């Protein structure tokens, strides 16, 4: 039961880590922009961009996929009312993260108070056009981008409208909540890169509180509770497996000793070691099948209930149940074989005399 649940949780964890997010999260570092550098952020960006191995630097108000929700904006009235998640960025952001434009253009230097919506927004609000206001009297739309994973898997971002937005010309209207996004070469030494970034930051803002992390770390942190629960279930599964092995070992020990004379007679009558082992294994295999049939609904229920916390989730695959059964079967067969091997190979005359 627990092994099945762990298998389902593993599927979702793997789905989270290996899904297409729509941007290059594995090569992007994120960190806070020190308050002391707010007025010199462009100079700071230039310093960081000049480091060997850095392919681009941008600024945003949030970290993608670090939360279940961000700013939610409502614009327009009546039939032209729109509601979407807003993600303030600078003009370099989409190119730094590798987010693809599907129509229109990317942001450029000098832009201010303009949107780039995702395809989900265009599908939900089909009247939105490039180079036109999102709604009458609102800011203009300069482009559309592919749907990306902008919040956690607890939401279905494939159907949720969102927009990247630049606050004021050259993001002049931003407050202090700014995040650095640094794209690095995939082959760069990560430890060395973090050290060099820290050196530049310390040089420009001595004593400031800063920390750079790869986006993968941030995403894992967003699922801390789910991953912790998975590890707990895995631990209980290992304990259950060990206890089961001890139980099977004890039963096999008792039965093999109890039937020692029978084993000797069977050996004299021509039974092979393999046939003796099969006699014991078959009995436990039947018990295993019965237990597995009873455990499947409970394992499915635990895994399915855990998946309910995710809006975007992987389907429960049949191979999880097959793999769980094969794993338990292998453990059982090895345990029975290990314990019965000695008695199955013992001199039958000696075992009969002993009895």
Where do the language-model regions lie?
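C-terminal membrane-exit region of the final transmembrane helix in multipass inner-membrane proteins
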Residues: 13, 258, 324-355
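Membrane-helix entry/capping segments
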Residues: 194, 203-239, 258, 303-328
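Alpha-helical transmembrane segments
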Residues: 1-26, 306-311
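Membrane-interface junction motifs in transport/secretion proteins
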Residues: 18-41
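Hydrophobic alpha-helical transmembrane segments of multi-pass inner-membrane transport and secretion
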Residues: 1-10, 227-261, 289-290, 294, ...
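Intracellular coupling helices
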Residues: 246-287, 345-354
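Mid-to-C-terminal secondary-structure elements
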Residues: 46, 50-221
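Juxtamembrane/transmembrane-helix interface segments of polytopic membrane transporters
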Residues: 7-10, 282, 287, 295, ...
């Amino acid at each position: 039961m627990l092994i099945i649940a762990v298998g389902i949780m593993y599927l979702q964890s793997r789905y989270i880590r290996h899904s297409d997010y729509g941007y290059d999260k594995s090569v992007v570092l994120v960190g806070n922009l020190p308050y002391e550098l707010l007025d010199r952020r462009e100079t700071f960006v230039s310093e960081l961009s000049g480091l060997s191995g850095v392919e681009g630097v941008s600024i945003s108000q949030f970290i993608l996929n670090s939360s279940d929700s961000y700013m939610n904006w409502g614009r327009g009235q009546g039939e032209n009312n729109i509601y979407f998640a807003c993600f303030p960025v600078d003009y370099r952001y989409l190119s730094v993260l590798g987010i693809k434009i599907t129509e229109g253009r990317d942001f450029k230097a000098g832009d201010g108070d303009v949107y780039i919506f995702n395809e989900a927004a265009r599908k939900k609000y089909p009247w939105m056009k490039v180079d036109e206001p999102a709604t009458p009297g609102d800011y203009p739309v300069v482009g559309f981008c592919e749907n990306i994973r902008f919040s956690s898997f607890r939401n279905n971002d494939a159907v949720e409208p969102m927009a990247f937005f630049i606050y004021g010309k050259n993001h002049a209207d931003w407050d202090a909540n700014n995040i650095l996004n640094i794209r690095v070469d995939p082959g760069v030494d990560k430890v060395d890169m973090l050290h060099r970034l820290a050196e530049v930051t310390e040089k420009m803002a001595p004593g400031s509180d800063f920390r750079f992390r790869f986006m993968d770390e941030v995403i894992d942190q967003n699922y801390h509770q789910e991953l912790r629960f998975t590890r707990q279930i895995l631990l209980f599964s290992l304990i259950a497996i060990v206890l089961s092995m001890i139980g099977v070992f004890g039963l096999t020990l008792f039965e093999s000793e109890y039937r020692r004379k029978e084993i000797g007679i069977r050996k004299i009558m021509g039974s092979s070691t393999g046939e003796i082992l099969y006699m014991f294994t078959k009995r436990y295999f039947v018990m295993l099948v019965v237990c597995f049939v009873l455990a499947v609904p409970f394992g499915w229920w635990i895994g399915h209930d855990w998946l309910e916390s995710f809006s975007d989730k992987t389907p429960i695959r049949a191979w999880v149940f097959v793999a769980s059964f094969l794993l338990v079967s292998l453990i059982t067969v090895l345990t029975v074989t290990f314990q019965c091997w000695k008695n199955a190979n013992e001199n039958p005359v000696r075992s009969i005399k002993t009895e």
